Amino acid sequence: MSEISRQEFQRRRQALVEQMQPGSAALIFAAPEVTRSADSEYPYRQNSDFWYFTGFNEPEAVLVLIKSDDTHNHSVLFNRVRDLTAEIWFGRRLGQDAAPEKLGVDRALAFSEINQQLYQLLNGLDVVYHAQGEYAYADEIVNSVLEKLRKGSRQNLTAPATMIDWRPVVHEMRLFKSPEEIAVLRRAGEITAMAHTRAMEKCRPGMFEYHLEGEIHHEFNRHGARYPSYNTIVGSGENGCILHYTENECEMRDGDLVLIDAGCEYKGYAGDITRTFPVNGKFTQAQREIYDIVLESLETSLRLYRPGTSILEVTGEVVRIMVSGLVKLGILKGDVDELIAQNAHRPFFMHGLSHWLGLDVHDVGVYGQDRSRILEPGMVLTVEPGLYIAPDADVPEQYRGIGIRIEDDIVITETGNENLTASVVKKPEEIEALMAAARKQ
């Protein structure tokens, strides 16, 4: 279960209810199970919005929040009934009797009876909040219940006349992390950092990329994070220039770099770190020259990110650092200001500098036009500058095929930011020292 307290989940539900109209109900559905092949399923992963309000990790569940008026509201959970045979085969179920105490909801009803029960809860209300289009099974249930109400006027049934998507409201709530959430994210960052450190220590020429992937996942598991928060990227050599490379199947060669973008999922929350280091433990001059530009971009971002700034504003400073550095190396040619105006950096830095982080690795929340939203305390985001010199790029030969990204996770505080992932080294000399020490053991 979640390390978020029951009281926090109750506060979140109350915060949503306070933004709902009187005479309304919000329906939040659990994620369905997903088939991997034939009769095998992927490990179950709960819908992040449902988890945000419940911390409940079973499928076939619906949270119903009902606001009768400004002073009366209640919560109902539909979930699976206890079934001893099913539980022998597939694991324990919470059931209805234990759910109110465990989850802090007012009452629990059997999911198998939702078509018979939900229409009674919605009868006479004016508004239903529902994330239409998210899950087909959820739409089928909601549409069936509403149609039953519409056709039941002779039985004194009335359907809500308005349907509103709750996602804009909920996703704005999720953008601002509570102290409890930040504590879990901090732990996710610590575990992820330990895994990246392990990868640096274990790396040797002749290993395959999937060997480091295994080392990383092993470290996640050792600390109670069973799954990565996204598909792990271990790209050596030219593979580091592929942003979402996940094949992880090539032999790592002496003299190449390896870019690892990996994060654990801990109690539902994501870590997300990237480190790039030499397979043999020693940067070449060309690798170091590109690395220093990326590192300066990251360190400048960490100094600048604070309340009142924006991703757009900080990105502008990073682009100037990158363009200036690439001009000095002869990779770009011309006036720095003119090159920036021409977006000349885009072939080498083609992704965003930052994204929100939380229950989803690319977390929800509005960024604003061109990521111009002003940052506020409680927002959690990544900082991930990178430079990728394609193998066939028209640049000095020594730089071709070099891909470097360095990424940390930060939370915006009242006075600046806290780096949640600072415990894994990123300065070149520190990386080399760590890898050299590991080789002596």
Language-model features, listed with the residues they occupy:
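Active-site neighborhoods and metal-handling regions in enzymes and metal-associated proteins
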Residues: 1-441
